[in-house]
């Protein structure tokens, strides 16, 4: 499985280089729109919870939006420790199966690439709130798979199925990026499920690369009560 501290730092360094900035910026814009569209008569900041926040790359960016009080949690202690250094949000260690928050506590809930716990997500979301979930698009990291596999395949674009929340909107965020170092290639590989199910002989194909061009492709879905 590797060293959790090393993997957390590797993930942080990769994201800090801006490869996934298009997704970060799209999430920030959604938060800005929520704040600007809030009724003028409503007092106080909007509350946001980022589920499985990792090392806080997206959380801190969303939390920096004026008028937002952001919180993020992760099961990994090292992830939370790194996230706390970013600021612009309050971070804590928790399990998504039992989120330590009151019913309806958050105006916005965000969940990027994490398992979908319908019951808990719906519970902590305010009655008029929005839940944003992010899943990989069909061509996400296709360039990586072209190197790893003789017959690369497109991702199934599977949105979470839920009976407690209603899908009200979707948007795609896509770009083409060039990973500039072997460390970046290895870091993004470790962030994918392919890392754990790819044969060692196929992994060696990546080890010989110094740069890699690939699509990134995300789907952001909005759910409400």
Listing of model-derived features with the role each one plays in the protein:
Residues 106-120, 135-137:
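A short SAM/SAH-binding and catalytic strip from SAM-dependent methyltransferases
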Residues 128-139:
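Conserved beta-strand signature within the Rossmann-like core of class I S-adenosyl-L-methionine
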Residues 33-47:
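Short helix-loop-beta connector
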């Amino acid at each position: 499985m590797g060293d959790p501290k090393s993997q957390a730092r590797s993930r942080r360094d990769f994201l800090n280089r801006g490869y996934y900035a298009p997704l970060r910026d799209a999430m920030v814009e959604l938060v800005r729109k929520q704040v600007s569209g809030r009724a003028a008569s409503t007092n106080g900041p909007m509350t946001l919870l980022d589920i499985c926040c990792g090392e806080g790359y997206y959380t801190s960016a969303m939390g920096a939006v004026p008028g937002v009080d952001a919180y993020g949690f992760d099961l990994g202690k090292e992830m939370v420790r790194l996230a706390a250094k970013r600021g612009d949000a309050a971070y804590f260690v928790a399990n998504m199966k039992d989120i330590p928050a009151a019913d309806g506590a958050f105006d916005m809930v965000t969940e990027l690439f994490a398992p979908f716990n319908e019951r808990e997500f719906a519970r902590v979301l305010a009655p008029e709130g929005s839940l944003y979930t992010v899943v990989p698009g069909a061509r996400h990291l296709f360039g990586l798979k072209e190197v790893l596999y003789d017959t690369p395949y497109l991702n199934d674009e599977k949105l979470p199925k839920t009976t407690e929340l209603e899908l009200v909107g979707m948007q795609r965020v896509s770009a083409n990026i060039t990973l500039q170092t072997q460390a970046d290639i290895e870091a993004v590989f470790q962030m994918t499920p392919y890392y754990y199910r790819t044969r060692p002989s196929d992994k060696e194909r990546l080890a010989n690369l110094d740069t890699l061009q690939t699509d990134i492709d995300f789907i952001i879905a909005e759910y409400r009560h």
